[in-house]
């Protein structure tokens, strides 16, 4: 027994000194914060005073748990086993971990007593000169001595009575002050059914401690043995469970340590990123503010320039108007009030002046307009290393000055993508140099106006727009290109869509001899031949066109459309050639 028990006790003592398993080694209630009074052990292995548990708010458990519930079957070892079908529906929450505790039929007092806590409380009281301990027999006076044989704490009166009785005369009595070095001074655990008997045996069938009277009574046919004899088997089973639990504790502690490390790293990373965000934002804000100031200055310069132009034009027109009025008024006065001689005398001067005034060139339109637009989505380059958006544009696109360009402007092939380019200009005919205009394009078959072709408009951001479409059928199509709901120059226009490009069936070669690898039977549509029985063309021989060409139709352009019709005039065998 001693060999098997020492490692078990040693392991437990080691754990209690360094690891908190449940409430072992604790003496104060987590609720009332005082020394434990009748401590009860909950299924979650937390210990609470009986009175404190009774003050908790109970609740009804919705589902009646089965017989395997570990929270309802761990009643006090002093209670009779209850049928598993009679589980309680009343529960409480552990005040430490909030675990649900299903109370047994006997309520809180039917929960297991934490005898380890009782022993710790007693040791704690002994360290305080025994204050708070009352006699185990009379439950009235303070304790002075302890009977080591009965394991009972006795007051002075009960101690004297204990010595006078024959059965207890020779029991060893020890003063409380001499017990301070002890690690265990707990009371004997008595049988709840036979209060005069101590629990010394264990019923294997019922899996619970029993007394001698229980063995000869209710448990007489059950296998029973002394607790000192069965502690090895049951202690070892608990030991195995404990060894299986310890790695989980270590793993969880390691996981929590990793979480702490990651959390610390997370906080540092968040602070670093936040600093980067602040630095970036502050720099970006300064760049935007600087760009804002530049835009406002540019806007002010544009205003000043336009105002100066308008004022200059105004002054010129006012002066011209004054000259015109002077000429008109003087001439009218001369013609209406002057004599014939006076008119003839001043005629030369008046005519010369009026002719000069009539030759003056002037514009009735303002020399500048009020077209100023802010384009927030247009790139404005970089400022302080940041990409900045937003420009001020004074140009306004003029649909009448916009032109269409491209080889596929008036021709296309069925099921092949055709494209052209729209070049936008302002009223002065200058290229806009920017995008962002609302370009509308429509491609409609002339005989199927309700079936428009899908078009794509790509803004090149430089004043040009790439427009593409894919006609599905050959025929005549009408194309509309509008800006600001106005047709551009040349719109609308028609496009002739021809049938799909016919691919070449032969090879594009220099001669038949080279492309066929010297085969005599290979022929070419160019009609050239070679001496020696060769039916195809060869360099420098009769009929060779002198240029690379297609063997199927004889065309010189590699990207051309094949013109071979496959008729009698050009039999298939004539065009055959072999390409290595």
Swiss-Prot record:
EC class (word): transferase
Expression across tissues: Expressed in skeletal muscle, brain, heart and pancreas.
Alphabetic keyword roster: Coiled coil, Cytoplasm, Metal-binding, Nucleus, Repeat, Transferase, Ubl conjugation pathway, Zinc, Zinc-finger
ZnF segments: RING-type: 29-98
Protein name in the entry: E3 ubiquitin-protein ligase TRIM45
Catalytic activity: S-ubiquitinyl-[E2 ubiquitin-conjugating enzyme]-L-cysteine + [acceptor protein]-L-lysine = [E2 ubiquitin-conjugating enzyme]-L-cysteine + N(6)-ubiquitinyl-[acceptor protein]-L-lysine
UniProt xrefs under InterPro entries: Bbox_C, Filamin/ABP280_repeat-like, Filamin/ABP280_rpt, Ig-like_fold, Ig_E-set, TRIM45/56/19-like, Znf-RING_euk, Znf_B-box
Protein location: Cytoplasm; Nucleus
CDD domains the UniProt entry points to: Bbox1_TRIM45_C-X, Bbox2_TRIM45_C-X, RING-HC_TRIM45_C-VII
Impact upon substituting residue 94 to A: Loss of ubiquitination activity
Binding-site positions, Zn(2+) 1: 135, 138, 158, 162
Major localization listed first in the record, in broad terms: cytoplasm
GO cellular component: cytoplasm; cytosol; intercellular bridge; nucleoplasm
A Gene Ontology molecular function term of the record: zinc ion binding
Protein's gene: TRIM45
Enzyme Commission code(s) on record: 2.3.2.27
Positions annotated as zinc finger (B box-type): 130-176, 186-227
